[in-house]
Design a protein with these regions (language model features):
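Residue register of alpha-helical TPR repeats
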Residues: 82, 89, 162, 167-169
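Acidic, glycine-rich segments characteristic of secretory precursors and extracytoplasmic regions
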Residues: 1-13
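Short, flexible, mixed-charge acidic loops at enzyme active sites
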Residues: 101-117
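Conserved, well-structured interaction surfaces
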Residues: 21-98, 123-132, 142-157
Length: 169
């Protein structure tokens, strides 16, 4: 998981006793965090999640979810919709933690990552504006809405969503 541990703050109090020395809250309590090793970092953890999601979005069409092409399309659309929604959510939390006004009076956000990164990626990029980040989040939400079902339930083979029936699936 990109977050390394479950979200819980109780373990950071004197109410909890942990035996797991690799737990991030134990690392915090024992002073083993550094500026380049912050396990609770929104920057690091959210960008890790976005990297995983971007990689998934790039490779999703190549996965054979089913040998039936129509079923494969249904799976692919739903998974892509979930990925767009998760990327928007992670971008929101990243923007909330690191967006803000700069000395030049501009409201900045964070660098927008639309594609997965590799060793040849230029990592020296400037922050995008807050407005551009919000636009990116809304685009991902719109993509998610287009691809996700209205409700999640157990479906039968005859229970095809109307949008796919209209397409002849």
């Amino acid at each position: 998981s990109p977050y390394n541990s479950p979200v819980t703050n109780e373990v950071a109090t004197d109410n909890a006793v942990l035996n797991d020395v690799s737990n991030n809250w134990v690392k915090l309590a024992t002073g083993s965090w550094t500026s380049d090793n912050d396990e609770a970092s929104q920057w690091q953890n959210r960008y890790h999640a976005i990297q995983y999601i971007n990689t998934f979005l790039e490779r999703c069409d190549d996965v054979i979810w089913s040998t039936d092409e129509n079923v494969r399309r249904l799976f692919n659309d739903r998974f892509k919709g979930e990925a767009y929604g998760l990327r928007a959510l992670n971008m929101y939390y990243l923007l909330r933690a690191h967006g803000g006004w700069a000395d030049d009076g501009v409201l900045y956000g964070v660098p927008i990552k639309r594609d997965s990164e590799n060793p040849n990626t230029d990592f020296n990029v400037k922050r995008d504006t807050f407005k551009d980040c919000m636009k990116f989040i809304f685009e991902d939400c719109e993509n998610a809405i287009k691809l996700l079902p209205i409700d999640y339930k157990e479906h039968s083979e005859t229970d095809v969503p109307q949008v796919y029936k209209d397409m002849g699936i």
